[in-house]
């Protein structure tokens, strides 16, 4: 399949380890694709949960996926500053239908003041036992938590102000020319 181009809209689908669909985001504008990474933005996009519940995101969010890392990053742009929601997840794949990944439950939330919280450890442990996450998967995920925290602490990639400014401005340019 051809990679989506700048300005194209894609869906994002999150799955669980057992293959069940977890959550879908309907419209994310692609801002950049490379061999390994996808950067996009969505704003007031429809989200559908696995139980059929639907809701709409409240603010613009830049998304970052990379094929070499077991996490993805959502930077929510709010009046009080940027908050981040980071999912520990498989590297993404892209097909005709959507950008897809497996959500491995653990999340890191970063508040505008820099405070970090590791979330959903209980859910991770329960699903690890239920779906028999391998020792290798567990090792990879824990190593990627360390990489992620290092990126956060050092303002690397999506955690830098410049990144947010560049990509959110690009989104606004593209969105207003439609």
From Swiss-Prot:
Cofactor(s) recorded in Swiss-Prot or TrEMBL: Mg(2+)
Catalyzed reactions per annotation: a ribonucleoside 5'-triphosphate + H2O = a ribonucleoside 5'-diphosphate + phosphate + H(+); a ribonucleoside 5'-diphosphate + H2O = a ribonucleoside 5'-phosphate + phosphate + H(+)
One Gene Ontology molecular-function label: ribonucleoside triphosphate phosphatase activity
EC code(s) of this entry: 3.6.1.15, 3.6.1.6
Database matches in InterPro entries: DUF402 (IPR007295), FomD-like_sf (IPR035930), Ntdp-like (IPR050212), SA1684 (IPR016882)
Top-level taxon of origin: Bacteria
Positions contributing to Mg(2+) 1 binding: 87, 103, 107
First-tier enzyme category under EC: hydrolase
Magnesium found in the keyword field: yes
Annotated coiled-coil segments of the chain: none
Annotated positions binding Mg(2+) 2: 105, 107, 120, 123
UniProt keywords, alphabetically: Hydrolase, Magnesium, Metal-binding
Similarity comment text for this entry: Belongs to the Ntdp family.
Function description: Has nucleoside phosphatase activity towards nucleoside triphosphates and nucleoside diphosphates.
NCBIfam families tied to this protein: PRK13662.1
Full protein name: Nucleoside triphosphate/diphosphate phosphatase
Classification of source organism: Bacteria, Bacillati, Bacillota, Bacilli, Lactobacillales
